[in-house]
Amino acid sequence: MAREAMIARTTNETSIQLSLSLDGEGKAELETGVPFLTHMLDLFAKHGQFDLHIEAKGDTHIDDHHTTEDIGICLGQAIKEALGDKKGIKRYGNAFVPMDDALAQVVIDLSNRPHFEFRGEFPAAKVGAFDVELVHEFLWKLALEARMNLHVIVHYGRNTHHMVEAVFKALGRALDEATMIDPRVKGVPSTKGML
């Protein structure tokens, strides 16, 4: 069975069409209206081997907040839907990714218990026109809607672009690991019998 999902979300602030294949080839077709976010999601898809398609229109004439947040919501919903009953998945994923001066770690548990922790400080408030505080907003909404336990640690770095890039690459790699089918796992990977 294909582990895919299509999500459509329209509000007074944004209109988003998103499709995701967990068992893809790392192909991304992205029109987010937020160039830096587009770049980060391209890296996420490539390093997670996900096929990701996004068409988003939002009130970016105000700022990038609503579009960034709503894409996080839609991507989280797509991950949850594509996983289905979660039978046979590894459930946990952990990735360290260096990017020049920066080192980031992302740890995931696809537990159906949404939680988000972020540790680290970005030296700059913006990368180009993008407000770096929106990275936190995006990741929190992603974790909430995917119903995952998501821990993000930026260990160090000097260049904010490199630090955020390391986070999104690590996010892709950790989610790829957590969503992989492990042939040794019979049913759902939980002693409760459900996730």
From Swiss-Prot:
GO terms for molecular function: imidazoleglycerol-phosphate dehydratase activity. One of its GO terms (cellular component) is cytoplasm. InterPro entries: IGPD_sf, ImidazoleglycerolP_deHydtase, ImidazoleglycerP_deHydtase_CS, Ribosomal_Su5_D2-typ_SF. It comes from the Bacteria. Pfam families: IGPD. It is found in: Cytoplasm. GO terms for biological process: L-histidine biosynthetic process. PROSITE patterns: IGP_DEHYDRATASE_1 (PS00954), IGP_DEHYDRATASE_2 (PS00955). It catalyses: D-erythro-1-(imidazol-4-yl)glycerol 3-phosphate = 3-(imidazol-4-yl)-2-oxopropyl phosphate + H2O. Keywords: Amino-acid biosynthesis, Cytoplasm, Histidine biosynthesis, Lyase. The keyword Lyase applies. Its EC number is 4.2.1.19. Pathway: Amino-acid biosynthesis; L-histidine biosynthesis; L-histidine from 5-phospho-alpha-D-ribose 1-diphosphate: step 6/9. NCBIfam families: PRK00951.2-1, PRK00951.2-4, PRK00951.2-5, PRK00951.2-6. This is Imidazoleglycerol-phosphate dehydratase. It comes from Geobacillus kaustophilus (strain HTA426). The gene is hisB.
